[in-house]
Structures are given as C-alpha cells and as structure tokens.
Amino acid sequence: MTAMDLKLIKMVSDHYWIKSDTVVDKLSFKGRTLYNKYEKVNKPLNQQVINQHIKGEITVAHSLINSRDKVENIVIDYNGRDPQRFYHRAQLLLREEGYINFTAFETKTEGHLHLYIHKGHTTLQEAYQLGKMISMKLAAKMPKQWRVFPTQDLPLEYNILNLPQAVYAKERGASWSKHM
C-alpha cells in the first residue's frame, strides 16, 4: 500500500482514530448501548502513522464524514466469504448505475473488502440514500453480507473505517458509462 493508493480514497485526514485494547467510551444511541474502542487523535493523518498501521504496530481508522457533514465516499464493507463474486456483482451494478470511479481494498481479515465508491462532496442525507439504494440493489442479486457506510444506524463519530491494507481492484472512468 502506497501513499498514492490511499490518495484514491480522499479520506478525512485532519484527524484519525487509534484502536485501543480497552473501551474508550460508552454511548447510548437509539435505545442501544455502544462501546467505542477507538480514540480520536486530533492531529493530521500522516505517512508515518499510515506506515505503522500497515506494519501492524497500531490499528488506525479514518472518518467518513468531514466537519461540514459532507461525504467523499460511500463505502461497502463486505464481510462475506467470496470477495471475487461480490466485487464482480458490485462492479456490474455500479457501472449500470453510472458510477465510474470506485476502488476495492483488502482489509486485515482475509476475504473482507472495503469498496469505496468515489462520489465527492455529497451531503450526508444524500449519502445515506445512495448507500441504501445501492445496498438494496445488491441484495436483490446476492445474500447480504455487507454494511454500507455512512449509516444512520450509528452516531456520526462511529462512522469510521480501518485504513485498508492493499488495493484489491480499482476502476477509473469508462467510455461505456451511461451517465457521462
């Protein structure tokens, strides 16, 4: 994983989150109690921190929602057993829907993927709606083994994802996209 690979994500980099071995805080949200093991670090996410994450020394996560409630990426966190099949189905669906820029990253857990759909400066409400729509269309074609971020099921500060480990596949622009 290089710095250039991570630039594909356009992640919020004015702060980051470090995973702790213990619970950092407890929060009640929509009738549920959530326990957070990530501690917010109000320093810019730099290459040194990213390298420590890639080496496995620390676990770093990034926020998906910036301080102005805008979202750069809609992310599908796939936790199934067949990433190749999932990516193929998702790729076809995203092309059909007119999304031409998306990147799939491998996570620390083998077989799990983070599929970043690059939307750019999307309002939070629009991101929620697009995420639900994409998830519903995917669920019509295969068993649901993923979560979509950002999600309304979690507080804003819990809409974070671990930094990816390696690029699985990427797609940048295509002449056959119907929405060009």
Question: Where would I find each of the regions flagged by the language model?
Answer:
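Alpha-helical protein-protein interaction elements
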Residues: 8-9, 130, 138, 155
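Histidine-centered divalent-metal-coordination microenvironment in nucleic-acid enzymes
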Residues: 75, 101-127, 160-163
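Short, surface-exposed, polar/charged, turn-prone segments marking secondary-structure boundaries
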Residues: 103-105, 142-145
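DNA replication initiation on ssDNA origins
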Residues: 1-74, 80-90, 144, 149, ...
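Residue-level signal for secondary-structure boundary elements
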Residues: 20-21, 102, 139
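Short beta-strand
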Residues: 64-65, 102-109, 151-153
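Active-site-adjacent loop/helix surface patches within enzyme catalytic domains
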Residues: 75-78, 87-94, 99-106
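Helical (often loop-to-helix) elements that flank the catalytic cores of nucleotide-handling enzymes
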Residues: 84-97, 117-144, 171-180
